[in-house]
Amino acid sequence: MKSGAEPRTSLFVRGGALFDRVDYRLIETPEDKDCLYLMRYRAYLHGGLILPSESQRVSDRYDDAPNAWTFGIYVDGELCSSLRVHVLTPEWRMSYATELFGDILHPRLDQGEIFIDPARFVAEPEKAQRFPDLPYLTVRLGYLACEHFNADTGLALVRAEHQAFYRRVFLNETIAEPRSFPNVTKKVALMASDFRTVRETVLARFPIMRSSAFERRMLFKRDRHSFHEAVISTFEPASIIPSS
């Protein structure tokens, strides 16, 4: 679906010039998944994160996790980047964040916290150079998920060279030192921010992060399994989603 920040952003703010050319689409068909896995391979190989492989594809067991939404970000109809958004709840904990940093996250989940874990952020190397604001429009999906699911905390697994970006945009802080990520040559640290505390500051600094309730519903509502209904039921008392 077309991105729908509200109000419309100026061309002079981050992401504004690209905003009206972007579509967010769930990656669901075998053809779309293959294109995504190939793009991941090219991006990771270009970034020195993996060695060449015969398959030229990168996928993992969490791609079809019931608590994950995998989006493609399309500019003028072309797949340019992707983000997989995990919703972590006491009942649903499947992600690399809990696999790598379970000693930190599981006790908090046991206390009832809700996390949004944006993972597998990749961009087509040529498109990343062509569209310097593409990262902002990609990570925006994680921010919208925090709003939609009434999350307590936004997470990020981040390599050292990208930590400054997450501090600047989402006011994230490092809460765990780098650990090895499966099948990748560089370690990742665990970063986090309290969503309700930073929300207004982020919106003021980056208006591109604004959204409508309609946009969030269109992005995260799906019928192929019961997870969405279970999550919305859990959050219903504080939800921003109108009841039908």
For every predicted segment, state its role.
Residues 1-19, 236-244:
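Short acidic N-proximal helix/loop "leader" segments that mark the beginning
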Residues 95-193, 197:
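Acyl-donor binding region in acyl/amide transferases
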Residues 75-107:
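Short, His- and charge-rich active-site/binding loops that engage polyanionic ligands
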